[in-house]
């Protein structure tokens, strides 16, 4: 698509925005219900597209994509009217006879750039929040998940007018061309490298951004943890979608006294959840493409594999794999793994672990398995991270009642539920001053008595 054509789409959306149509909350509710209907009506097509792109099972497609999207819509439909209401706030004495209030307003024309790993969820979740806030949206799904991207384009264009919502497919050239346009807000989910470029391009128009990136999310297991339960939940969170989850536990960081017992439990759980031959499990997915398959395989040091390690280049599959004797200097610890490889590293003291985690880039997530309240308080207070779980993994992502987002190198801003509505809204602070009285204190000429009165109401 040419730059001029993109600009025409944006101009049409901006013109539609200025009609004020989407300021009506009833219009937004109708749009959310239409999106809800679209997803339910075409659930089987969505499932088939996810199977093609990522070999996702029917169960996983609903649990991790379609179901979560429908849950977000359901939540937003219940709360949108209260979110969109003007909110009265207190007025200082110096401004008496006034009404002070905060008014949520849509930004206008927004761009949502989504990734390939959860191509339905991570495209439609921010779209729901943007619609609820009253924006127009251009969606740019990933070229790496073509079946899902093409399906989204077909469905969105069938159910919504392009002046309101539209999908632009394509690869790097389309991304580059889009980022050169003037948007009122940009929401990006993806790699840190591209995130920096998004922010750089947005700065030329002073466009605000939300960046949902990634990082090496640690999974701490202390000496008090229930190892059987920890292993079960770590294996679930790590190997879901073949480890291609932005909040997957990147590595296990456990108390050195519990390592051997934990490894035994991890091995047992991998076999229990995926079978003795995971690559033959019909519900086990695949790596998205050859490029990422080779990247992950380069991180797989055979000398450090203690479980798994099998690969199938023909199907782009890598079995759930445990690695031991890994150091923080190893290649696998220099980048986000984003695949089914799980290093197990030990610490001697919890303070040592906290210091090490804080010496690294801020992770998108952190997980702690512990029964000790003091350890839970210490880790959640002292470690820098976007969000996380205590005694579980990744489930903090799956709730509309809390915002989800990163910090530092793992991103900025948040979304889901009310946080998502606020992300796509500019809140105007307004004072409505009454006209029946106008005290002269603030006006020149200034006199000592005016300053005396001023000191009574200020400070």
Language-model features: locations:
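N-terminal Rossmann-like NAD(P)+-binding subdomain of aldehyde/semialdehyde dehydrogenases
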Residues: 1-101
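Rossmann-like NAD(P) dinucleotide-binding subdomain of oxidoreductase/dehydrogenase enzymes
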Residues: 93-229
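Residues at or immediately preceding the N-termini of alpha-helices
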Residues: 6, 25, 43, 227, ...
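ALDH superfamily catalytic-core signature
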Residues: 193-327, 390, 450-452, 458
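Residue-level signal for inorganic ion chemistry
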Residues: 28, 73, 134, 165, ...
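Conserved C-terminal structural/oligomerization subdomain of aldehyde/semialdehyde dehydrogenase
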Residues: 23-24, 220, 271, 318-459
């Amino acid at each position: 698509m040419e730059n001029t054509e993109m600009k025409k789409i944006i101009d049409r959306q901006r013109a539609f925005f200025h009609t004020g149509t989407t300021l009506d909350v009833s219009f937004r509710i109708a749009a959310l219900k239409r999106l809800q209907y679209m997803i339910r009506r075409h659930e089987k097509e969505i499932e088939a597209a996810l199977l093609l792109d990522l070999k996702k099972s029917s169960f996983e497609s609903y649990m991790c994509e379609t179901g979560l999207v429908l849950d977000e819509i359901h939540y937003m439909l219940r709360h949108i009217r209260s979110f969109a209401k003007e909110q009265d706030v207190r007025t200082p004495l110096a401004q008496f006879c006034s009404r002070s209030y905060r008014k949520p307003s849509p930004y206008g024309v927004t761009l949502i750039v989504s990734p390939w790993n959860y191509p339905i969820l991570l495209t439609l979740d921010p779209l729901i929040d943007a619609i609820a806030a009253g924006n127009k949206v251009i969606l740019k799904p990933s070229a790496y998940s073509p079946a899902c991207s093409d399906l989204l384009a077909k469905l969105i264009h069938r159910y919504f007018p392009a002046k309101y919502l539209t999908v632009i497919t394509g690869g790097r050239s389309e991304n580059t061309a889009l980022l050169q346009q003037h948007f009122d807000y940009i929401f990006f989910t993806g790699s840190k490298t591209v995130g920096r470029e998004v922010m750089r391009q947005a700065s030329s128009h002073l466009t605000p951004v939300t960046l949902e990136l990634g990082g090496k999310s640690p999974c701490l297991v202390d000496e008090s943890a229930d190892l059987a339960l920890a292993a079960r939940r770590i294996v679930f969170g790590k190997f879901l979608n073949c480890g291609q989850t932005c909040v997957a536990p990147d590595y296990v960081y456990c108390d050195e006294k519990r390592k051997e017992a934990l490894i035994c439990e991890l091995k047992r759980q991998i076999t229990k959840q995926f079978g003795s031959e995971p690559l033959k499990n019909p519900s086990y997915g695949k790596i998205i493409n050859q490029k990422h398959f080779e990247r992950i395989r380069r991180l797989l040091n055979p000398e450090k594999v203690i479980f798994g390690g099998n690969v199938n280049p023909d199907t782009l599959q890598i079995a759930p794999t445990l690695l031991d004797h890994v150091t923080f200097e190893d290649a696998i610890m220099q980048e986000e793994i984003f695949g089914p490889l799980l290093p197990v590293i030990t610490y001697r003291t919890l303070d040592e672990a906290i210091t090490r985690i804080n010496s690294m880039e801020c992770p998108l997530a952190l997980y702690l398995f512990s029964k000790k309240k003091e350890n839970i308080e210490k880790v959640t207070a002292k470690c820098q991270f976007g969000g996380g779980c205590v005694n579980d993994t990744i489930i903090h992502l799956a709730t509309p009642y809390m915002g989800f987002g990163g910090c530092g190198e793992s991103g900025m801003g948040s979304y889901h539920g009310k946080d998502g509505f606020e992300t796509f809204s500019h809140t105007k602070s307004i004072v409505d001053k009454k006209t029946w009285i106008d005290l002269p204190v603030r006006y020149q000429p200034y006199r000592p008595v005016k300053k005396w009165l001023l000191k009574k109401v200020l400070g």
